[in-house]
């Protein structure tokens, strides 16, 4: 498939089941939904929003959100809101706590329960150590920037990650049976917030005192463009304005667009006759449920008339292939390995969902700000008309990226995706070089059957080449899982499970 483009993104859930509440009059037990009248007073009560008469949980904005439709509620990071209803799942109905009392739908992953741990700027939840290091080492974070995350190994415990001068230090935060927390046993705290407040004032054994929360690289993606678009994701073409072409693939064009006059999106327009609309909608309904920070979010489709529109998030730098051949030429090995680990993370999620990509290649991986990579076009190859695919590519699929069992017998599995990932590793480490240079598709297929594998590219570490070769094992069952590939690449430059941790227990 040709490359599709998408925007920034990320991942904080901010979900909770209970919230802080507002003191109010009791609900009438006899008439549901009506409010008990207050006792008569000499003076009339002040005018307040109706929501304050009911005990609704209070949530706080974790990110800025600008309304996309008339049904949405805009808010800023730190704004307080009453959550009126959570029945809509990913989109909650809320009322602003300010005197205006505006109402509307909000993305549930943009808010957190007021005064909860999730509401703290420095709490990142389920973030891996390597991701914490990556974020803290970004140029916009400084000495003493920090975050607290869930422990990688011990449920209920936490880890404190702090930016030192040129590296990140990690400290284990443990919980005692009495519910207190500590970094060192000589000093315990009633809450994580108290611990942070203490170490903000003095280092007391840390590499530096805590200066400020780690700044996030991207906001999380919302579930769909809006509440309505999430439920009825077939949208009208008149809602989309195509702004500028971003490129053309085998089966259509990619555009930067604007949805509803408010939201930047990427639009893939498919050439008429490319696929059966019925089969596409069946596959797209599955694709829309696949959500992961390293997968491109499918927002909506337009299938009432051709060309079909596929609407997704917009990524600033386009395909990984073009990025590597252009602005990415200056990337060093750690950046290249990190980008590969991001792809493996997204594919590991597909693996867990028993979903097969079928066309994994650098052209189908997109790049955003801060070298964020996301897998795109997963599943589309399955619904492309076979005759058209053959006419465009000279084969039913791109041979040089395809595992031999898939190329010869159409045996597509997650293990054939692993083979393709090995080719992606080659593309990345060579800054976008075409695989099997100088060989035709027929020659490649013949040579692979005779156990030929591409030699180690210049500048490629032996350790990385060994991972490539594992991906290209003849027996699909012998190839690694994407889960294994993900941690191998994440830990590529570390030594030992406890690397980077400082033990302050004493």
Swiss-Prot record:
Binding site for ATP: 246-254, 268
Enzyme class: transferase
Keyword Oxidoreductase: no
A GO molecular-function descriptor: ATP binding
Domain (SH2) ranges: 122-214
Keywords: ATP-binding, Cytoplasm, Kinase, Nucleotide-binding, Phosphoprotein, SH2 domain, SH3 domain, Transferase, Tyrosine-protein kinase
CDD domains assigned: SH2_Src_family (cd09933), SH3_Src_like (cd11845)
InterPro entries: Kinase-like_dom_sf, Non-receptor_tyrosine_kinases, Prot_kinase_dom, Protein_kinase_ATP_BS, Ser-Thr/Tyr_kinase_cat_dom, SH2, SH2_dom_sf, SH3-like_dom_sf
Active site, UniProt feature: 359
Catalytic activity: L-tyrosyl-[protein] + ATP = O-phospho-L-tyrosyl-[protein] + ADP + H(+)
Residues covered by region (Disordered): 1-53
PANTHER family in alphabetical order: TYROSINE-PROTEIN KINASE
Domain Protein kinase: 240-493
One matching Pfam family: SH3_1
Subcellular location: Cytoplasm
Residue ranges with Polar residues bias: 1-10, 18-31
Family recorded in the similarity comment: Belongs to the protein kinase superfamily. Tyr protein kinase family.
EC number of the protein: 2.7.10.2
Domain SH3: 54-116
Protein name: Tyrosine-protein kinase isoform SRK4
Origin organism lineage: Eukaryota, Metazoa, Porifera, Demospongiae, Heteroscleromorpha
Highest taxon of the lineage: Eukaryota
GO CC annotations, alphabetized: cytoplasm
